[in-house]
Amino acid sequence: VNHKSRRIQVTDTYAQSIAHMLKYDSLYDIFDADVQSKKDALLVDGREVKIFAEGDPALLPWKELGVDIVVESTGRINNPEEAAKHIQAGAKKVVLSGPAKGSECLTVVMGVNEDWYDPAVHHVVSNASCTTNCLAPVAKVMHEKFGIVKGLMTTVHAYTNDQQLLDMPHRDMRRARAANLSIIPTTTGAAKAVALVLPELKGKINGFSMRVPIPTVSVVD
């Protein structure tokens, strides 16, 4: 929690559960702050963080609360039109924490193309995927210094919630296998997404992902 932020609100459910997970993380250990919960809020070192359990972004009280920027990271919304409902609710800007789907939406990777952002025009912006944020800055430097004719990337990626703890049917038969026991080859949109922030590399980079049995840390080569 950034104590320099003016206001912070969270859209989720079960404040008590969120407070416990924030305080005690399976991977990152104990959060060095006093974390408490009440019916509709977290208390972090005495500072209140309101929690809302509203599924429709248009119904959230962003105008009443004076919210400027919404970080849409629920994983349920990746369509700019749907994300724009936060603006209907009173927010000024929306940042998608993953790749945008549907209509055209500005994708920004910091250090690569943030100068494309025009606050008068861009109200819903995608921050791309974690893999794209890893790949694009490296590709930018390599292309500027040496020139990329063709590229092949591999991301060795920690397993995610889209996978199964035990073998279980899945639309992708490889992902049907137990995430904590398997190295699973799968697709990644990161290579294609690089062209959204580095259009000069469109069609030049391809790649795939290897989901490996670790809960955190990923790498791109």
Predicted regions and their residues:
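N-terminal Rossmann-like NAD(P) cofactor-binding subdomain of oxidoreductases
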Residues: 1-176
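C-terminal substrate-binding/catalytic lobe of Rossmann-fold NAD(P)-dependent dehydrogenases
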Residues: 145, 150-154, 161-221
